[in-house]
Design a protein with these regions (language model features):
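Extended catalytic/binding region for NAD+/ADP-ribose chemistry, centered on the ART fold
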Residues: 46-75
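Active-site and NAD+-binding cores of ADP-ribose-processing enzymes
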Residues: 1-42, 46, 75-199
Length: 199
């Protein structure tokens, strides 16, 4: 690690700032044929846990939108309409858990974390942090959405526990007003289906 790089988790973690889940619904955009409560075990998620998995959610619908589609943009900020139509927006009530709040400024002094934790592509390192925090007894991580250049939107990584959450998700097609919000805020354009076929 360079002197300015993201540090590895220490052997002994101090008490960290937390947020309680379970009071407000969280949001997730996912394929229509996939359960909203999907705990990803794969290596391609920032805070994925290899054994129990991690489910990434957003505090606002627009956060779920930008995290889902921000990495799939075509040149010009375009998303084909069929891709959007194949997804669902789910409102989920998370399990009651205490998650580490990595948006709290005190994590700089407590464990040396900077904003790089929210955006680095070194997933081996961020997954190492997730494992260390899970082993310390935390139920997940609150962090900044990578695809929001303003750094305002917040995501939640919920660690898998081996038991499926009891809450029932309310799934619906991506609403038009959310598409309009993404256009107004992030200049993301959903290309109508007939244009998609011409490409």
């Amino acid at each position: 690690m360079s002197p300015r790089g993201l540090p590895a988790p220490p052997d002994d973690l101090p008490e960290l700032p937390t947020t309680k889940l379970g009071q407000k619904p969280l949001w997730r955009i996912h394929p229509a044929d996939v359960d909203p409560w999907f705990f990803d075990l794969g290596p391609d998620g920032r805070f994925n846990l290899a054994e129990s998995g991690t489910c990434c959610l957003a505090e606002e619908p627009i956060g779920a939108f930008v995290e889902k589609f921000g990495r799939l943009l075509r040149p010009g900020g375009v998303i084909p309409e069929p891709l959007v139509d194949a997804q669902r927006l789910s409102s989920l009530r998370p399990p009651k858990a205490s998650v580490v709040d990595l948006t709290d400024a005190t994590v700089l002094g407590l464990i040396g974390l900077t904003a790089e934790i929210h955006s680095t592509s070194d997933y081996d390192l961020t997954q190492g942090w997730a494992l260390a925090l899970q082993e310390a007894g935390y139920g997940g991580i609150r962090y900044k959405a990578r695809h929001d250049p303003r750094g305002e939107l917040v995501s939640i990584a919920v660690f898998g526990s081996g038991k499926a959450p009891r809450s029932v998700a309310k799934a619906a097609s991506i609403p038009v007003d959310l598409i309009h919000e993404a256009s107004a805020t992030f200049a993301i354009t959903v290309l109508p289906r007939h244009h998609s076929r011409r490409r």
